[in-house]
Design a protein with these regions (language model features):
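Short helix-initiation/N-cap motifs at beta->coil->alpha
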Residues: 86-88
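Active-site histidine-anchored catalytic micro-motif
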Residues: 91-92
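Short helix-loop capping/hinge motifs at secondary-structure junctions, enriched
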Residues: 224-228
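Short, well-structured beta-strand segments enriched in hydrophobic/aromatic residues
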Residues: 107-111
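Conserved "HGTGT" condensation-loop signature of ketosynthase/thiolase-family condensing enzymes
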Residues: 1-82, 98-102, 112-208, 215-216, ...
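Conserved beta strand-loop-helix elements of the APE1-like EEP
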Residues: 214-222
């Protein structure tokens, strides 16, 4: 076992919270994020003064961790504001685990917040993509539409297969009172297929929600976790992999970096895909869960279009049980909400 795998079971999530999910007029992104932090600490039974590691990323703050620590009035020994998009917070979990295990810090908080829906617009610190900007794509949906179109072509999938992902997500949301679409009723394949086109083959209901929302988790070492108020959730396996940022640089439009990172995360954990009772995936668009299920090893390449028929409440493989980004909440960067669920 290499050195990085030594973080297996050495740290745990001991508190978690979300705040302002849906529409929260009058709140700033920072206020929402700070509220989630306080609630997560309360869930853990830990005082704010004990937080010495802070991790945050948003689309609105170039130095999110510094801004949040200033707002909270704390002076962390370790801060990380790395922003790699919606997966930033999964990367923060790994960095926090290493910082905790090496003794750099004792208590880590990972946080995110956005008021993009109630603010009525989208502000971003993201720079233009040099090989794509001249073509004026509607990002990020154009990128995922390219991946979806290629998948449909290469594996004989249909738009109805994409629609099934949205239908299953809504079915889960109907069971979740916290979900933004909880009271909106079920979806049918025809509902999704007949929704307003966005970028072919994706329509409006193939795309994630636009909501406000904030989330936070608290992590500590396993030896301290047993003293916290909530039941610890131990980190058993984690990994990262990055191939590209621009869709034009993606080596294979139907294969994500989860193919590599998933194998290493499972190896670290000592488990395999068939051991999983539930799966939480980033579903910004309906193509995502299909690709991730394949790349993570839950089925062979090209078989995801069939497996997704079994991911709803009546199926055999519970996926995105909150309703996911398609029907529960999606305030711009969804990764931390996947972790919470």
């Amino acid at each position: 076992m290499n050195e990085i795998n030594n973080i297996r079971g050495k740290t745990a999530v001991v508190g978690l919270a979300e705040a302002g999910c849906g529409v929260t007029p009058g709140w700033t992104a920072m206020e929402l994020m700070a509220t989630a932090v306080h609630d997560a600490l309360d869930d853990a039974g830990i005082n704010l003064s004990q937080v010495d590691g802070l991790f945050a990323a948003t689309a609105f703050h170039s130095m999110a961790a510094m801004s949040l620590s200033e707002y909270l009035g704390i002076r962390p020994k370790f801060a990380d504001g790395s922003n790699i998009g919606g997966s930033s917070f999964l990367a923060h979990v790994i960095t926090a685990a290493i910082a905790l295990e090496t003794g750099l810090i004792n208590t880590a908080v990972i946080a995110y917040g956005s008021n993009q829906r109630s603010a009525g617009g989208f502000k971003t610190i993201s720079e233009p993509m040099p090989y794509e900007s001249d073509y004026n794509p509607r990002m990020p949906v154009s990128a995922y539409a390219l991946a979806a179109q290629r998948y449909l072509h290469e594996y004989g999938a249909k738009k109805e297969d994409l629609a099934q992902v949205a239908v299953s997500a809504r079915d889960w949301a109907l069971l979740n009172p916290r979900a933004y679409m909880h009271d909106r009723g079920p979806l049918t394949i025809n509902d999704v297929m007949s929704a307003r086109p966005i970028v072919d083959p994706l329509g409006k209901l193939d795309c994630c929600l636009v909501t406000d929302g904030a989330a936070a988790i608290v992590m500590t070492r396993s030896d301290k976790a047993k003293d916290c108020k909530s039941t610890p959730i131990y980190l058993l396996g984690a990994a990262m992999e990055h191939h590209h940022r621009m869709i034009s640089e993606m080596p294979d439009l139907t294969r994500t970096s989860a193919y590599e990172s998933g194998q290493r995360a499972f190896e670290m954990s000592g488990y395999k895909p068939s051991d999983m009772d539930t799966i939480q995936l980033y579903d910004a668009f309906t193509i995502n869960p299909i690709l991730f299920l394949e790349d993570l090893g839950f089925c062979k390449k090209g078989e995801g279009k069939d497996l997704i028929k079994n991911i709803g409440p009546s199926g055999t493989l519970p996926v995105n049980t909150s309703g996911g980004g398609l029907s529960c909440v999606h305030p711009g960067m969804y990764g931390l909400f996947v972790t919470l669920e």
